[in-house]
Amino acid sequence: MTIIIDGKKIASGLCEKLSQRIDVLKREHSIFPCLKVIFVGNNPASQVYVRNKQKKAESIGISSETIVLPDNILENELIEKINELNNDRFVNGILVQLPLPNHINASKVINTVSVEKDVDAFHRENVGKLVKGEKNCLVPCTPKGALHLIKLVETNLSGKNAVVIGRSNIVGKPMFHLLLQENCTVTILHSQSKDLAEYCSKADVVVTAVGKPNFVQEGWIKEGAIVIDVGINSVSIEGKTKLIGDVDFDRVKEKTKAITPVPGGVGPMTIAFLMINTVIAACLQKKVDASDFVS
């Protein structure tokens, strides 16, 4: 019987537990987690993401503010704003909502965020810590959430064959390193890879994040595999817009041990782990043990 992984329910449980921990941190350590989100421009999809992040933060006791800046802001002005937040001791987490306008160097902006406040964990130093396998550090939210779902199904991943489809800095590459740290044998595939079906057919775990609707087919997946679909694709079906993943869900699910739907799979976990990262950042800044937050 295939497990349809309910990411929304799992994320809700994580946030409920986190809310209780935040109450303890406030009461016993005078830690009041604070997240600042910088949103440049007026991208409609980004507006939805930002609104959901702020709503979730406030619902569990994290102080949150979205700083909206015009899309014609100069790069140096944006960097000045980030440095202002870097120097604010009451701010624990800083998130720069991507994408940024074309005239702004996103890499430069991301690496301006203080390492200890980088709750997206995109700063080069946090990336280096992940690659080195350092514990008790900030890890990108989406792959961290995806790994949490995998380990709810299969607690011991040692020796498992895993395939990651997609090599982005946001999902694919960090997912590769997280699975490697679990002692998986990991293969990362991308747009130039050949024989994708052959690699996937040997995998115990498949994580896909390529942004291509119904890309992963039933014939690619072996019986009993765990399939984590990070893709979010907007398609028109019978005149209606619908969100679907990278996986041909209805066909693939029949072969899997467990699979995530889209929507309602990895997406809610991303927001949950952003909240967790914000609290971890606050604890690390205040020298309070945060090891039990790291899944």
From Swiss-Prot:
It catalyses: (6R)-5,10-methylene-5,6,7,8-tetrahydrofolate + NADP(+) = (6R)-5,10-methenyltetrahydrofolate + NADPH; (6R)-5,10-methenyltetrahydrofolate + H2O = (6R)-10-formyltetrahydrofolate + H(+). GO terms for biological process: L-histidine biosynthetic process; methionine biosynthetic process; purine nucleotide biosynthetic process; tetrahydrofolate interconversion. It comes from the Bacteria. Transmembrane segments: none annotated. The keyword NADP applies. Pathway: One-carbon metabolism; tetrahydrofolate interconversion. InterPro entries: Aminoacid_DH-like_N_sf, NAD(P)-bd_dom_sf, THF_DH/CycHdrlase, THF_DH/CycHdrlase_cat_dom, THF_DH/CycHdrlase_CS, THF_DH/CycHdrlase_NAD-bd_dom. Its EC number is 1.5.1.5, 3.5.4.9. NADP(+) binds at residues 166-168, 191, 232. GO terms for cellular component: cytosol. Belongs to the tetrahydrofolate dehydrogenase/cyclohydrolase family. PANTHER family: C-1-TETRAHYDROFOLATE SYNTHASE, CYTOPLASMIC, C-1-TETRAHYDROFOLATE SYNTHASE, CYTOPLASMIC-RELATED. Catalyzes the oxidation of 5,10-methylenetetrahydrofolate to 5,10-methenyltetrahydrofolate and then the hydrolysis of 5,10-methenyltetrahydrofolate to 10-formyltetrahydrofolate. This is Bifunctional protein FolD. It comes from Wolbachia sp. subsp. Brugia malayi (strain TRS). The gene is folD.
